């Protein structure tokens, strides 16, 4: 295993594992673990260096997910979704959106997540099968 994986595993043993049983039993989000992930810089792992991030890629992302999931599947999955959301913002977001969201990730340790599902298509969040009808007073969504 790589040095990065070993460091992520050490982090997980110290900051995720102590909360794992409780968050699973209470069906809760791993708040304390995520606070520590932010402080340690994991939220900005895949943010390009020119935007203030660590500029790492999929290898480091997958190693962090694997290490975190070894202590808690919940923490590993939630962390993975943060980076999925972040990669979509970086690839498809407007410059205005990128500047706002990425700045919050880098400077304020914000993490991202989806609250999304589309009937019959799973979570194809960047190419939704939905139609918007704009009227004078409202937007009607169908799909």
Predicted feature residues:
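Short alpha-helical functional segments enriched in proximate histidine and acidic residues
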Residues: 15, 19, 88, 112
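Alpha-helical interface subdomain recognition
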Residues: 1-66
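Short alpha-helical linear motifs
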Residues: 31, 84-87, 125-127
């Amino acid at each position: 295993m790589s040095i990065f994986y070993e460091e992520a595993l050490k982090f997980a043993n110290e900051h995720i594992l102590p909360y794992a049983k409780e968050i699973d039993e209470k069906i809760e989000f791993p708040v304390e673990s995520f606070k520590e992930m932010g402080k340690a810089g994991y939220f900005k792992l895949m943010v390009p260096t020119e935007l203030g991030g660590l500029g790492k890629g999929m290898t480091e992302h997958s190693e962090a997910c694997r290490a975190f999931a070894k202590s808690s599947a919940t923490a590993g999955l939630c962390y993975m979704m943060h980076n999925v959301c972040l990669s979509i913002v970086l690839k498809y977001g407007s410059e205005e959106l990128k500047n706002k969201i990425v700045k919050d990730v880098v400077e304020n340790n914000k993490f991202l997540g989806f609250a999304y599902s589309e009937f019959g298509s799973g979570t194809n969040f960047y190419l939704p099968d939905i139609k918007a009808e704009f009227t004078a007073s409202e937007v009607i969504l169908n799909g």
